[in-house]
Curated annotation (Swiss-Prot):
<dbReference type="Pfam" id="PF00595">
    <property type="entry name" value="PDZ"/>
</dbReference>
<protein>
    <recommendedName>
        <fullName>Delphilin</fullName>
    </recommendedName>
</protein>
<keyword id="KW-0966">Cell projection</keyword>
<keyword id="KW-0472">Membrane</keyword>
<feature type="modified residue" description="Phosphoserine">
    <location>
        <position position="303"/>
    </location>
</feature>
<comment type="subunit">
    <text>Interacts with C-terminus of the glutamate receptor GRID2 via PDZ domain. Isoform 2 also interacts with Profilin-2/PFN2 and with the monocarboxylate transporter SLC16A7 via PDZ domain. The interaction of isoform 2 with GRID2 is dependent on GRID2 phosphorylation by PKA.</text>
</comment>
<feature type="domain" description="PDZ 2">
    <location>
        <begin position="268"/>
        <end position="345"/>
    </location>
</feature>
<feature type="region of interest" description="Disordered">
    <location>
        <begin position="611"/>
        <end position="656"/>
    </location>
</feature>
<dbReference type="GO" id="GO:0099072">
    <property type="term" value="P:regulation of postsynaptic membrane neurotransmitter receptor levels"/>
</dbReference>
<feature type="domain" description="PDZ 1">
    <location>
        <begin position="1"/>
        <end position="79"/>
    </location>
</feature>
<feature type="compositionally biased region" description="Polar residues">
    <location>
        <begin position="500"/>
        <end position="509"/>
    </location>
</feature>
<feature type="domain" description="FH2">
    <location>
        <begin position="812"/>
        <end position="1203"/>
    </location>
</feature>
<keyword id="KW-0677">Repeat</keyword>
<dbReference type="GO" id="GO:0099092">
    <property type="term" value="C:postsynaptic density, intracellular component"/>
</dbReference>
<feature type="compositionally biased region" description="Pro residues">
    <location>
        <begin position="786"/>
        <end position="803"/>
    </location>
</feature>
<dbReference type="GO" id="GO:0043197">
    <property type="term" value="C:dendritic spine"/>
</dbReference>
<keyword id="KW-0449">Lipoprotein</keyword>
Length: 1203
């Protein structure tokens, strides 16, 4: 090899050509380039790590000759004639017609030769495979790219099923066989068995054909039809419309013994794994399924196969459990778990819609079944649920939504679902997904979810189907208004929700023909509130139905006989038509019979005719305690009450925007998370009020000045309802033109009215600027009735609204001013905080957030000095029917849970006990029935209720019926013994074998005997001073556990370390004595007394069953004697074998005890074997310390044994 690079590349035996990129033209045989692996056709990509793929030959030569390394390292792309990457790289070079970027695979050459034997064969196969793909697919470049993408994905993920699935979809059917056969050489050996199984059986092809046929034959209504293993626990709302002759959906309940769909046959298997692993791999989720089974494993011995779904484990339902939970349950299932599996093909997460993109990675994730849970027939805006998730959400957001749905399917908690999903669906476009989520709920959950969304978010049309709207088209044309700001509530959506509300009761009722229900057309430039793309920002009028109903009941009770006809016809209130006086803009809507506007009176408690106290706001949730006088309607235009005085000219308030305030619900983690997420979405337009509002006023809307635009005309602002706040700070102020919610009625004054005295104005300010009301064209009674009823008693003049002043902090007025007295903290204030930590806190803007947070810590409840008011005694609750309970509370509770889990009626369970065929009873069920069975005293008390079982509770009635079965407890014990005999015998046999084998190992171990002799010699030397005088002939073996307690003089070493060091120097063959005693540590864990007791219990149970068989005569109904007699005949040989093994084990144990000089009557097996187990572990630890060089040593001393 040359000493320098000046003659590169000719001196190294190869030549370059090309003007960018450059290729190896010729390589001399036997040269250093040939030995380094260069071949003709290789493309030069790197020189000493520098990218040279686009450089000419001359520049590459100059660069290489300046390199200090001889020869310079090259990064090349093998040509079509060689290299393991020829399969992919050669095709890609032809495909794109240019050199590959440096991120592709590179073959690094550093002077070492290439292996020829295996690589040459693989190169040849790769070339053949590449040519074969070219011949089969021809010019279909997309299909070629999918094939090689699948190969690359398999190289990264090693998923055989996905590789075969992709090739099955891409390649023609006649070409699949040859291509898969030639592809087998590239499959690693550990995956070839699975590859051969999938290819030979054609599982994926069958699955694909079955799914295509299934999708063409029927319209899928729910995911439960595709996944029969899922339990139907309640009624599901069908997404597709039903035919008129189709029966309504029926509520289905799960049965343990039944099947919910056309799944494969089920079978019960018992896996005898002992201390081994199961020997299978699991995949999937709810239920999990077996992907592969290892040959010779316990799973294969139990006849488990690939594709089996695990439905039950030891009687526990695993059909809806997650993958991690099933794995943890299997790990703790014991030595012989019982599985109920369902046969079927290997599940694969794909749908008919996914055939166009077979290599989608999301189709194989663990949560993909959530995205595919709705059938493809359910589409919104032309997309399915899965497609909308991919289109609208990012991968983290998709995972969050699917994870939230997964948790919801487990606990069925609507609140948690809303809290988890709402922060993700934060834009109008994303809120289309609510329409899909609505289809996954039961009918009861749909109503609850709709109510909660309306309560928290203020809209319902997002989740209501369009079919629920029953509106007639507008008959008369309306002038086209200008677009309104999107933040306001559309009049049409408000009217639709008002018309849909069946329970909305108001004090204003329209007579027949007076108030025709007409839809409001949408304003151009605005969206309908139910189109799935907008989020209304105003409260739902349905929420005010409770307020209207209460106020109307008070009004009707006071005016009984005068306006009784108003309650006959209850319809949704029409929306007044508002006409601007200073501009051409109008708002389309349902108009009153009159062309003029309705008033917007300002309600005040003084209108009731008396002086209101602070507590009088309870009688009217809309009442204001402001003592300022409210303006009356304009003179000459009528008013609500004839005797009301006129008001001055109205003052036009400035433009305002809405600020929403939500009263905090009951404190919980879910509500806190939801309100935090809500505040992040609505930002400064949300204020969380921590006062205890009544249910009638649990939603607040406050107004504030708009400094950033979104103005409305003064005429429109003057038409807003002016409702002042109460003393507690709860207010309901509608200040937008779009809030066409009629005001609640006035409470009638109690007769006779008190004289009114105008008080001085209060210092309190209202929540926002008040718009003066305008007048009525007619009295209100004339609007609703052709003939006006007698007028009510005259009212005192109302108090005018407060001046337009704004207090942004009114939302927290209750918590700041009217909280109870609390204990004071007796701290000493710092006079000068400048330069201290307290001065830094004052500069931190987070202190205001902490101050707001403190208000919700319920400090008044913990440190309050005022006693809470005593609860008012309410009406006596309805007394339930008295029942007699005989079982203890714990037994009754557990019996109820067991009955709900068994899904068996008392009659069915009685039939099982009489026939002695417990097909639906697991050993765990039988053990629980035995545990909760009544004792003798309880059985005696049950005799008094033989004639009147209805007086007993449900668990007691069940026990009473079970006591009618002859020898109830004996039958349960017999069935439990029959189900667990094999498991118990194997456990006892294993323990006895362990004792016998450990005894033989101790007696036959020559290494252990040599070590004991060495210890004896060392001890005699230390005890007597001379090795051959007055020596001890033996010692108790329990001294072996105390060897590490004898310290050396310096305290840095022990007798055990000296023993290990001496043995390693003079008898190294004795250091592995523990290998001759592998069973001793296991025998130390066997409890001899418990083992003997278990064997005695088996014989006692057999004797009891034999006596029961003799006492109970067989009959057509009672098969106890026949079944158990046959069982005992088969069980006797196993019991006799156990007895023989026990005698042999005890005999060997006694010999071992005598061999080591121990008393067989005073020493137990666990103590005897525990001594040797502890000695072995301590000796290994000491030896490890010495070998690691960190063991304690005696400095400056030479061991007397190191001769």
């Amino acid at each position: 090899m040359p000493a320098t690079n000046q003659g590169w590349p000719e001196d190294f035996g190869f030549q370059l050509g090309g003007s960018g990129p450059c290729f190896v033209i010729e390589v001399a045989e036997g040269s250093s380039a040939h030995a380094g692996g260069l071949r003709p056709g290789d493309q030069i990509l790197e020189v000493e790590g520098l990218a040279v793929g686009g450089l000419s030959r001359e520049r590459i030569v100059r660069l290489a000759r300046r390199c200090p390394r001889v020869p310079p390292s090259l990064g090349v792309l093998p040509g079509p004639e060689g290299g393991p990457t020829a399969l992919t790289a050669a095709w890609l070079t032809r495909r794109f017609g240019r050199s590959l970027p440096l991120s592709r695979e590179l073959l690094r050459l550093a002077g070492g030769p290439r292996p020829d034997a295996v690589h040459r064969e693989r190169r040849r196969k790769a070339q053949e495979f590449s040519c074969q793909v070219d011949d089969i697919l021809g010019d279909r470049l997309t299909a070629k790219e999918q094939v090689f993408t699948a190969l690359k994905q398999f190289a990264a993920e090693q998923r055989v099923d996905e590789l075969v699935w992709t090739l099955t979809l891409v390649l023609p059917s006649e070409a699949q066989g040859p291509v898969l056969d030639n592809l087998r050489i590239f499959i690693p050996k550990k995956h070839r068995a699975r590859f051969d199984e999938v290819v030979s059986q054609g599982l994926l092809g069958k699955l694909c054909r079955a799914r295509r046929a299934q999708g063409a034959q029927r319209l899928r209504r729910s995911r439960s039809e595709e996944r029969p293993e899922r339990l139907l626990v309640s009624t599901r709302a069908s997404a597709a419309p039903r035919r008129p002759d189709e029966p309504p959906p029926r509520k289905a309940t799960s049965l343990l013994g039944g099947r919910t769909g056309p799944g494969g046959p089920r079978r019960t298997v018992r896996v005898y794994k002992g201390n081994k692993s199961f020997g299978f791999t699991l995949r999937g989720h709810g239920p999990v399924w077996i992907e592969s089974v290892l040959p010779g494993s316990p799973a294969e011995n139990a006849s488990l196969k690939s594709g089996d779904r695990i439905l039950f484990l030891n009687g526990l339902d695993m059909r809806n459990c997650s993958h991690d939970k099933v794995v943890s349950m299997l790990q703790g299932s014991g030595a012989m778990p019982t599985l109920v599996v369902e046969e079927g093909p290997v599940p694969f997460a794909s749908d008919s819609d996914s055939l166009d993109s077979p290599t989608r990675a999301s189709a194989l994730t663990s949560l993909q079944w959530v995205a595919d849970i709705l059938p493809s027939s359910i589409r919104v805006q032309g997309r399915t649920f899965s497609q909308q998730l991919d289109h609208l959400l990012t991968p983290p957001e998709r995972y969050g939504v699917c994870r939230a749905l997964e948790r919801f399917f487990q606990h069925r908690n609507i609140d948690t679902l809303i809290v988890d999903v709402y922060p993700v669906l934060d834009t109008p476009a994303k809120q289309v997904l609510w329409q899909f989520l609505y289809q996954l709920l039961t009918y009861e959950e749909q109503e609850l979810c709709q109510e909660k969304i309306a309560c928290f978010l203020g809209y319902t049309a997002m989740t209501e189907p369009e079919s629920s709207l029953d509106l007639e088209p507008e008959s008369t044309p309306e002038p086209t208004p200008e677009p309104q700001p999107r933040s306001s509530l559309r009049a049409s959506s408000m009217c639709r929700r008002s018309l849909r509300s069946q329970g909305l009761e108001t004090s204003l009722s329209c007579g027949p023909g007076d108030c025709p229900e007409m839809p409001l057309p949408l304003i151009p430039g605005e969206r309908q509130a139910g189109d799935g793309t907008s989020l209304p920002e105003t409260p739902n009028p349905k929420m005010m139905s409770a307020v209207y109903a209460e106020l109307e009941s008070r009004l009707n009770s006071s005016f009984k006989g005068k306006i009784g006809t108003m309650s006959k016809s209850r319809a949704s209130p029409p929306v007044p038509s508002l006409v601007g006086t200073s501009g051409p803009r109008t708002l389309s809507g349902v108009s009153w019979p009159s062309d003029r506007l309705l008033p917007s009176p300002c309600y005040d408690p003084l209108c009731s005719g008396g002086l209101a106290s602070p507590s009088s706001s309870e009688s009217h949730p809309y009442a204001s305690l402001d003592s300022s006088r409210a303006p009356s309607p304009q003179p000459g235009l009528g008013s609500i009450h004839a005797d009301s005085p006129p008001s001055p000219d109205p003052i036009r308030p400035p433009s305002r925007r809405k600020l929403f305030a939500f009263s905090r619900p009951v404190r919980s983690r879910d509500t806190d998370r939801f309100l935090d997420a809500l505040s992040e979405q609505l930002g400064p337009r949300l204020s969380i009020v921590d006062d205890f509002l009544t249910p009638e006023n649990d939603y607040e809307e406050m107004s504030f000045h708009d400094d950033q635009g979104s103005f409305v005309t003064n005429e429109r602002s003057s038409a807003s309802e002016c409702v002042s706040s109460s003393e507690e700070g709860s207010s309901l102020t509608y200040s937008s033109i779009s809030d066409h919610i009629p005001p609640p009625p006035l409470s009638p004054p109690p007769p006779p009215p008190l004289p009114f005295h105008d008080p001085k104005p209060s210092s309190r300010t209202s929540d926002g600027p008040r718009g003066p009301p305008q007048s009525l064209t007619k009295p209100l009674t004339q609007i609703n009735h052709p003939v006006p009823p007698p007028p009510p008693p005259p009212l005192p003049p109302p108090v005018p609204c407060a001046p337009p002043m704004l207090s942004r902090g009114v939302g927290h007025r209750r918590s700041e001013t009217s909280h109870m007295s609390v204990k004071r903290l007796r701290w000493e204030q710092v006079e000068n905080s400048e330069g201290t930590i307290w001065g830094q806190l004052g500069e931190d803007s987070d202190y205001d957030k902490l101050s707001d947070m403190v208000k919700y810590l319920d400090l008044e409840l913990h440190f309050g000095t005022q006693k809470p008011p005593k609860p008012v005694p309410g009406p006596e609750p309805f007394r339930k029917k008295e029942v007699v309970e005989i079982l203890s509370h714990k037994k009754a509770y557990n019996t109820s849970i067991l009955l709900a889990h068994l899904k068996l009626t008392p009659g069915e369970l009685r039939q099982v006990l009489m026939s002695m065929e417990p097909r639906r009873l697991e050993p765990a069920h039988l053990a629980q029935l035995l545990l909760f069975a009544p004792d003798a005293d309880e059985e005696q008390r049950y005799q008094a209720f033989r004639e009147a079982p209805g007086r007993l509770s449900e668990p007691d009635q069940f026990v009473l019926q079970m006591l009618s079965v002859p020898e109830y407890k004996t039958r349960l014990r017999s069935l439990h013994f029959q189900a667990t005999l094999q498991e118990k015998t194997e456990e006892i046999r294993g323990s006895l074998e362990c004792l016998r084998q450990a005894s033989l190992e101790l007696k036959n171990s020559r290494k252990l005997a040599k070590i004991l002799e060495f210890v004896l010699a060392m001890g005699n030397y230390l005890n007597d001073g001379q090795p051959k005088t007055n020596k001890t002939t033996g010692f108790k073996i329990n001294f072996l556990t105390e060897l590490n307690s004898t310290k050396t003089v310096d305290g840095k070493s022990t007798f055990l370390h000296i023993l290990a060091k001496s043995l390693s120097q003079h008898f190294p063959e004795l250091l592995g004595f523990a290998q001759d005693l592998p069973t001793v540590p296991l025998a130390a864990k066997v409890n001899q007394r418990a083992l003997t007791g278990d064997l005695a219990d088996l014989h006692d149970t057999v004797s009891e069953i034999q006596v029961a068989c003799q006492s109970m005569a067989p009959s057509s109904e009672d098969r106890f004697a026949v079944v158990m007699a046959s069982f005992l005949e088969t069980a006797q040989p196993a019991l006799r074998a156990l007895d023989g093994l026990q005698r042999e084990a005890m005999e060997e144990l006694g010999k071992a005890l005598a061999f080591f000089g121990e008393d067989s009557k005073a020493t137990t097996s666990e103590a005897f074997f525990g001594i040797f187990s502890e000695f072995m572990s301590k000796f290994e630890r000491a030896l490890s310390d010495l070998q690691a060089g960190d063991g304690p040593r005696s400095s400056g001393m030479v061991s007397p044994l190191a001769w």
